[in-house]
């Protein structure tokens, strides 16, 4: 089963869930997860929890314990917050390149599904009649301790956007599209290194070429350990073909290490 994860603590999450039920045929069942009704359509469930999702390590085990099934993939429908309050629709995988400040464990990465994130990016961009920013975010926050692939798809970046009806519609349609298509869609995959939190060069590459990104390690986490790039490759559900570096957006020792590692592993090295 595929799982769409929502939480009652998050206005954007509830907005997206409402649109999924209204527009995409999800029906309430007699089952409960964390005390909340489970909604179902075909091979997909909508689950709701009562706390912040970024702290829900071992969610896959909780689903197995409560519902008797192991999810194939988990899509977290979430808000995005920023001080700049820029209207945005974003996607990313979770994990921590260093200390775990907001969920997950130190230097631990969730399992990325690059094709799903790229499909989300493309679909959000296609549907974006709001003229909001569409982008990847760098790998950050929890949960990191999941044994199945996952991704966050988010509405940002203030309450005005979180409750925006059209944004909820776009993300509901995006999520259903991604879950329907991701297994049959394959792209060349890269680990992304460098740039800012909103990964502008990686986003541009993904929107304009066939490249899909897995984990993205922004400049603010550099210098980056070689072991963490290896972990990012390991924690990717699809074959990794390349290491991509935003050259000017990376610290010297990290970009040189990444270039050497690509050569060592026989991966394509891509730089912008």
From Swiss-Prot:
UniProt cofactor(s): Zn(2+)
Assigned protein family: Belongs to the DtdA deacylase family.
Highest taxon of source: Archaea
InterPro entries membership: Deacylase_DtdA_archaea (IPR018033), DtdA (IPR007508)
Name under which the protein is recorded: D-aminoacyl-tRNA deacylase
A GO BP entry: D-amino acid catabolic process
Presence of the UniProt keyword Signal in the record: no
PANTHER family documented for this protein: D-AMINOACYL-TRNA DEACYLASE (PTHR34667:SF1)
Subunit structure: Monomer.
Lineage: Archaea, Methanobacteriati, Methanobacteriota, Thermococci, Thermococcales
Catalytic activity: a D-aminoacyl-tRNA + H2O = a tRNA + a D-alpha-amino acid + H(+); glycyl-tRNA(Ala) + H2O = tRNA(Ala) + glycine + H(+)
Entries under HAMAP family matching the protein: Deacylase_DtdA (MF_00562)
EC code(s) of this entry: 3.1.1.96
NCBIfam families associated with the record: PRK03995.1-6 (NF003074)
Co-factor: note: Binds 2 Zn(2+) ions per subunit.
Pfam families cross-referenced by the UniProt entry: tRNA_deacylase
Function: D-aminoacyl-tRNA deacylase with broad substrate specificity. By recycling D-aminoacyl-tRNA to D-amino acids and free tRNA molecules, this enzyme counteracts the toxicity associated with the formation of D-aminoacyl-tRNA entities in vivo.
Disulfide linkage: none
MF terms (GO), sorted A to Z: D-aminoacyl-tRNA deacylase activity; zinc ion binding
Annotated keywords: Hydrolase, Metal-binding, Zinc
């Amino acid at each position: 089963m595929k799982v769409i994860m929502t939480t009652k603590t998050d206005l954007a999450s509830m907005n997206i869930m409402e649109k999924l039920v209204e527009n995409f045929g999800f029906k309430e069942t007699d089952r409960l997860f964390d005390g909340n009704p489970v909604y179902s359509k075909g091979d997909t469930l909508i689950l709701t929890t009562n706390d912040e999702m970024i702290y829900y390590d071992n969610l896959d085990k909780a689903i197995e314990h409560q519902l008797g099934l192991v999810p194939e993939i988990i899509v977290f429908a979430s808000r995005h917050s920023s001080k700049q309050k820029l209207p945005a629709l974003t996607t990313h995988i979770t994990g921590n390149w260093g200390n775990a400040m907001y969920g997950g464990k130190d230097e631990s990465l969730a399992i990325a599904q690059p094709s799903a994130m790229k499909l989300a990016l493309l679909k959000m961009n296609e549907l974006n009649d709001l003229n909001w920013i569409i982008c990847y975010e760098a790998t950050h926050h929890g949960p990191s301790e999941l044994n199945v692939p996952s991704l966050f798809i988010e509405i940002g970046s203030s309450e005005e956007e979180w409750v925006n009806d059209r944004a909820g519609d776009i993300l509901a349609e995006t999520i259903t599209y991604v879950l329907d298509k991701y297994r049959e869609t394959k792209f060349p995959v890269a680990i992304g290194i460098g740039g800012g939190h909103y990964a502008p060069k990686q986003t541009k590459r993904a929107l304009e070429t066939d490249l899909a990104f897995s984990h993205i390690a922004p400049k603010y986490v550099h210098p980056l350990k070689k072991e963490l790039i290896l972990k990012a490759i390991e924690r990717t559900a699809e074959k990794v073909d390349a290491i991509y570096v935003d050259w000017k957006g990376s610290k010297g020792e990290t970009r040189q290490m990444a270039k050497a590692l690509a050569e060592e592993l026989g991966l394509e090295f891509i730089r912008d």
